[in-house]
């Protein structure tokens, strides 16, 4: 209990003037004196508080006299709640505890260092560099801490390290950040946005390229919160400006044809510019460096001149948009740069300054051009399917010489030129011959007659094969029969038996030959009948006509003979009709 409460209880118990004393205690002179003191304390903080501030500008709390009285009367003398009267100075908040070494394990990354700003703002400055006991955050060595609570058993690492860091990865991260800020390490330009965030502040490395007045800005480093437009306008970020990096183009977009030849130049330039970024950042306080600016102009590459196209590749933290290529060139620049084609391009090759139409595939780069030696089966004069004519000079087989008798078109007719954008390119002369010269369409009806003849020939061949097969079979059968019927040499005792066996063998051979001839005759007759039945419809009329003529002549002949015999009978000679009848019978 406080002293005022004790006095009030005593006055209530004593009675009498207790009410007046209570009013004096509530509204008396003491209260009037205390109010201006509190107002003065809130307006002007006491000098003792300023003397006890820590090194990095965060005040240590000081206990006032009234709080001393209340603490002396309270039961808990080691209360952790401390009240600070006055303005809280800006800076990174410290969470130190009394009696122990102040260790801040809630690590935040450093913000932008742009030098001192003129005015102090109330609240927490998010752009202030993080520090632990006045030491910059990236230079703090974790091994210097005596107490390492994150190593204790059962400790949760997420209470001490944010964003999945542990002790080893945090050391590596600090080392890398120090090297990047000193300009010793080149920031890699990748296709994704690399963000390393710790608690509230983010550091964003944005790959992309900007052109302002013809100069390229390869990358832009942002630290702190993104989207703070006031601070971004007041404090411009660092930009290194040099020539076009070829690796920023996506594969779907048509790059310049000589990107490979300029790649080595731009990579060396990027290394030099990156190494010098950190030096002038520390020296000039991240202001724009006049030394790195280059005059706008064109890059001279062997064979042709190309201008710098405008590429913008900014990304925010929550956007996954592709790098946009915006070609902003006037017509006069195109006409000045490409009034004449390069000397080594053929007349039929597509020009480089015109964008390809959207419905055609992009022209291949020098590295992806099709090989000049085609696979077997494809003539070298025909480009592979899916590819336009390759850039650069065509192979010698595509260029017709003066002595070659090729005409400029197909079959002495000029072929239609295929459009490529707004420019038409004629076909290359001396290409493959046309289809009508390969396939003769005027004699298509010969094909069917030829096919019928081939079929008949195949049939005859099959028949001959069958006959040969049958003959072979019969010969083997004969040999087997002779083997079966042939007696042993001991049987041939007499000449008669030998003669009888020879006669038997000859008779068997004659019989077999007769049967074979009969089979062949029978087979030929069958074949003839098949052929006749096949062509019966065409021959039937002529056969009928022939048979009727034969029948008529035969009848006429018989009629004449019968007349003669009648005349002979009338003459009265008997042997004459017999002779005539005998003559007539064989005629029948």
From Swiss-Prot:
This protein's record includes keyword ATP-binding: no
Stretches with biased composition (Pro residues): 340-398
Region described as Sufficient for interaction with CPSF1 and CSTF3: 437-588
Stretch list, region Sufficient for interaction with PAPOLA: 1-96
Composition-biased stretches (Low complexity): 259-270
Gene Ontology MF terms in the entry: RNA binding
GO biological process, one term: mRNA processing
Residues modified as Phosphotyrosine: 420
Residue span of region Disordered: 1-81, 223-291, 334-588
Name of the protein described by the UniProt record: Pre-mRNA 3'-end-processing factor FIP1
Organism whose genome encodes this protein: Pongo abelii (Sumatran orangutan)
């Amino acid at each position: 209990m406080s002293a005022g409460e004790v006095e009030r209880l005593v006055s209530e118990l004593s009675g009498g003037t207790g009410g007046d004393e209570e009013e004096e205690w509530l509204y008396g002179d003491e209260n009037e004196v205390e109010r201006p003191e509190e107002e003065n304390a809130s307006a002007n903080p006491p000098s003792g508080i300023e003397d006890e501030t820590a090194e990095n500008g965060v005040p240590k709390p000081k206990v006032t006299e009234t709080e001393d009285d209340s603490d002396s009367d309270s039961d808990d003398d080691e209360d952790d709640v401390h009240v600070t009267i006055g303005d809280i100075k800006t800076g990174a908040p410290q969470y130190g505890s009394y009696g122990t070494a102040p260790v801040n394990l809630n690590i935040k990354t450093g913000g932008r260092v742009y030098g001192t700003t003129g005015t102090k703002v109330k609240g927490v400055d998010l752009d202030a560099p993080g520090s632990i006991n006045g030491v910059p955050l990236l230079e703090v060595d974790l091994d210097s801490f005596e107490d390492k609570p994150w190593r204790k058993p059962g400790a949760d690492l997420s209470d001490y390290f944010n964003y999945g860091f542990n002790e080893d990865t945090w050391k590596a991260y600090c080392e890398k950040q120090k090297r990047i800020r000193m300009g010793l390490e080149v920031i890699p330009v990748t296709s994704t946005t690399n963000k390393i965030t710790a608690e509230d502040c983010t550091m964003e490395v944005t790959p992309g390229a900007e052109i302002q007045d013809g100069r390229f800005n390869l990358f832009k480093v942002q630290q702190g919160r993104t989207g703070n437009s006031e601070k971004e306008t007041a404090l411009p970020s660092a930009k290194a400006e040099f020539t076009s990096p070829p690796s920023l183009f996506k594969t779907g977009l048509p790059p310049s044809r000589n990107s490979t030849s300029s790649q080595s130049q731009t990579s060396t330039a990027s290394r030099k510019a990156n190494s010098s970024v950190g030096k002038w950042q520390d020296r000039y306080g991240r202001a724009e460096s006049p030394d790195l600016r280059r005059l706008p102009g064109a890059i001279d590459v062997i064979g042709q001149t190309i201008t710098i196209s405008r590429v913008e590749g900014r990304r925010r933290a929550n956007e996954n948009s592709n790098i946009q290529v915006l070609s902003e060139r006037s017509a006069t620049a195109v006409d000045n740069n490409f009034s004449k084609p390069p000397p080594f391009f053929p007349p039929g090759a597509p020009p480089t300054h015109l964008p390809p139409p959207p419905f055609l595939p992009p022209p291949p780069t020098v590295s992806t051009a099709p090989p000049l030696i085609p696979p077997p089966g494809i003539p070298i004069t025909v480009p592979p399917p899916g590819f336009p004519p390759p850039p650069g000079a065509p192979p010698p087989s595509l260029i017709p010489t003066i002595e070659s008798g090729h005409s400029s078109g197909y079959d002495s007719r000029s072929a239609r030129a295929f459009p490529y954008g707004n420019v038409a390119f004629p076909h290359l002369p001396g290409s493959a011959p046309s289809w009508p010269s390969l396939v003769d369409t005027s004699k298509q009806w010969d094909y069917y007659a030829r096919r019928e003849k081939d079929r008949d020939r195949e049939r005859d061949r099959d028949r001959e094969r069958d006959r040969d097969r049958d003959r072979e079979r019969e010969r083997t059968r004969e040999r087997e029969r002779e083997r079966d019927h042939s007696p042993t040499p001991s049987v041939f005792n007499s000449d008669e038996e030998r003669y009888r066996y020879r006669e038997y063998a000859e008779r068997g051979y004659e019989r077999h030959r007769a049967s074979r001839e009969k089979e062949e005759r029978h087979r030929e007759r069958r074949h003839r009948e098949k052929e006749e039945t096949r062509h019966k419809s065409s021959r039937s009329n002529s056969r009928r006509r022939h048979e009727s003529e034969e029948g008529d002549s035969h009848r006429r002949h018989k009629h004449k003979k019968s007349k003669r015999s009648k005349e002979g009978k009338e003459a009265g000679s008997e042997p004459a009709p017999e002779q005539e009848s005998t003559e007539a019978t064989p005629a029948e």
